[in-house]
């Protein structure tokens, strides 16, 4: 039954709950929040609920400024960051799930072990085989090639919105990791492009992308992983 609400400042936050130690099925808890005494973002509401209503609620958070990517979750059907998502003024009920199609540790906390193992696989660091005694310099033009790529904060919103990643997360690297891979392919200081492309070759790691483009639509940083993936495909097909 939907709670009745005659107060525009009163919102009901409906949160997915599951605890591994409890054999019961997952459930929802509903928490009233007055926006007049709460911060403007969903993360503010979650912190207030944890502090004042239910200390057992589990979720990740850190910077509160859209930089760390910790508070990624599904809010009213969209993968986004709780710290950047305003509390809706035109909705009585806001529903929050963890990132979809991922194993859950507790409540809104997904298990990102596989995600970060894939990140490690692409060798996300500068590889330059030309010895140098000073720093590796980069022109402003070359640096500008990284705009729209390096800003990725590994929140996993895009990967968790990708149907190909849902069904092939053990093989397909997913949009977030492939965007990170392209970040190093596009870096003029890196000399390891050939080996990096070898890591991404084959049918499963890269070519499971079917350009559905959920990744680009959901990215809270307004990046375009789909474009980066297309660039990698072009490099492999025409190298």
Swiss-Prot record:
EC number: 1.3.5.1
Domain 2Fe-2S ferredoxin-type: 24-99
Keyword Oxidoreductase belongs to the record: yes
Superkingdom of the source species: Eukaryota
Main enzyme class: oxidoreductase
Subunit record text: Component of complex II composed of four subunits: a flavoprotein (FP), an iron-sulfur protein (IP), and a cytochrome b composed of a large and a small subunit.
Residues binding a ubiquinone: 167
Gene3D superfamilies: 3.10.20.30, Alpha-helical ferredoxin
The protein's name in its UniProt record: Succinate dehydrogenase [ubiquinone] iron-sulfur subunit
Catalytic reactions on record: a quinone + succinate = fumarate + a quinol
Alphabetical keyword list: 2Fe-2S, 3Fe-4S, 4Fe-4S, Electron transport, Iron, Iron-sulfur, Membrane, Metal-binding, Mitochondrion, Mitochondrion inner membrane, Oxidoreductase, Transport, Tricarboxylic acid cycle
UniProt xrefs under InterPro entries: 2Fe-2S_ferredoxin-like_sf (IPR036010), 2Fe-2S_ferredoxin-type (IPR001041), 2Fe2S_fd_BS (IPR006058), 4Fe4S_Fe-S-bd (IPR017896), 4Fe4S_Fe_S_CS (IPR017900), Beta-grasp_dom_sf (IPR012675), Helical_ferredxn (IPR009051), SDH/FRD_Iron-Sulfur (IPR050573)
Natural source organism: Porphyra purpurea
Limits of the 4Fe-4S ferredoxin-type domain: 142-172
Name of the encoding gene: SDH2
């Amino acid at each position: 039954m939907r709670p009745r609400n005659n107060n525009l400042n009163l919102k009901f936050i409906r949160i997915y709950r599951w605890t591994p130690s409890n054999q019961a099925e997952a459930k929802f808890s509903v928490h009233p929040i007055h926006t007049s005494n709460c911060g403007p973002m969903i993360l503010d509401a979650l912190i207030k609920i944890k502090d004042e209503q239910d200390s057992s609620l589990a979720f990740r958070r850190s910077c509160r400024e859209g930089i760390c990517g910790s508070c990624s979750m599904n809010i009213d059907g969209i993968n986004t960051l709780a710290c950047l998502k305003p509390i809706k003024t035109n909705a009585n009920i806001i529903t929050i799930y963890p990132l979809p199609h991922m194993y859950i540790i507790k409540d809104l906390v997904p298990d990102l072990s596989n995600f970060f193992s894939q990140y490690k696989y692409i060798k996300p660091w500068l590889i330059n085989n030309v010895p140098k005694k000073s720093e590796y310099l980069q022109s402003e033009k070359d640096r500008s090639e990284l705009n729209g790529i390096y800003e990725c904060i590994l929140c996993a919103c895009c990967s968790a919105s990708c149907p190909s990643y849902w069904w092939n997360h053990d093989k397909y690297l997913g949009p977030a990791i492939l965007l990170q891979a392209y970040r190093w392919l596009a870096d003029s200081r890196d000399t390891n492009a050939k080996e990096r492309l070898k890591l991404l070759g084959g049918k499963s790691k890269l070519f499971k992308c079917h350009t559905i483009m959920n990744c680009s639509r959901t990215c809270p940083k307004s990046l375009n992983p789909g474009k980066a993936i297309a660039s990698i495909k072009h490099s492999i097909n025409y190298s």
